Amino acid sequence: MDSKRDEKILELVKILKNTKYLVFFGGAGTSTDSGVKDFRGKDGLYKTLYKDKYRPEEVLSSDFFYSHRDIFMKYVEKELNIKGLKPNKGHMALVELEKIGILKAVITQNIDDLHQVSGNKNVLELHGSLKRWYCLSCGKTADRNFSCECGGVVRPDVTLYGENLNQSVVNEAIYQLEQADTLIVAGTSLTVYPAAYYLRYFRGKNLIIINDMDTQYDGEASLVIKDNFSYVMDRVVKELKKIQFGKTLKNI
C-alpha cells in the first residue's frame, strides 16, 4: 500500500468525520472514469482542433451554433455523446455521503447528467445538461434532432461560450457555498470563468482539492490530493462507513 496516499485519504476521512455541511464542486475530471473526455488534461478535447480547423471553444459557442448548426451537432454527437454513460465509483460515493447526511449539495460544471443518474438529489448544473433539449421556437422539450415538429430549431439546454449562466442556479450555488463548513473541489482545473470565481463565496474551514494537476486554489486549500477522484472518494466512503458501524480506524 502507498503510505502517502493512505495518509491523504485518512486525513480527508478525519475532516469529513467532523463535517456538518459538505458541498461538492466538480468538473470534467469527475466523469473521466465513466468514459467522458476531459477538457484541459494532457489528452483533453481542448488540445486538438476539430476537423483540423476549429477550436472546441469556437464550436461550442453560441455564435457557432447559429451559424454552423450542422457542424455543431456533429461535434456534440462525436465528442460529447453521453448516451450509455454510467456513474463511476466517485459518483456513487457522493450518493453515499448524501445518505449519511454530510453532503448537502453537488455543484457541477459537467453536462453529462451522471450525478442525477447516480442518485444525488440536490444537483446544481452550472452549465446545464445534454440530456435536455428544447425548441427555440415553441419552447417544447424535444429530442436530439435538428428540428421540432413545429419546424423550429432544437438546441441542447447547456450554456455555450458567449452565453450567461442560469442566474437562479448561480444564486443557489452561491448560497450552498456560503453555508458549507467543508468544500470538496474535484476534477477541475478551476480555469473556467465565471464558474471558478464562485469558490470565493466559500467561507468554511476546510477546502479540499482532488485533482491530477495543479490549480490556482492549491495554496488556499486545507488538503490537496493529486490522485484519481473515483479511487479517493470510494476509499473515503468505505473508511467513513467503518467508523459509522463502530469499527476503529487507525490514526482517526
Swiss-Prot record:
GO terms for molecular function: histone deacetylase activity, NAD-dependent; NAD+ binding; zinc ion binding. It is found in: Cytoplasm. Its EC number is 2.3.1.286. Binds 1 zinc ion per subunit. It holds the Pfam family SIR2. Keywords: Cytoplasm, Metal-binding, NAD, Transferase, Zinc. Gene3D superfamilies: SIR2/SIRT2 'Small Domain (3.30.1600.10), TPP-binding domain (3.40.50.1220). It comes from the Bacteria. The keyword Transferase applies. Zn(2+) binds at C135, C138, C148, C150. Transmembrane segments: none annotated. NAD(+) binds at A28, T32, F39, R40, Q109, I111, D112, H127, T188, S189, N211. Residues 2-243 form the Deacetylase sirtuin-type domain. The keyword Transmembrane helix does not apply. Belongs to the sirtuin family. Class U subfamily. This is NAD-dependent protein deacetylase. It comes from Fusobacterium nucleatum subsp. nucleatum (strain ATCC 25586 / DSM 15643 / BCRC 10681 / CIP 101130 / JCM 8532 / KCTC 2640 / LMG 13131 / VPI 4355). The gene is cobB.
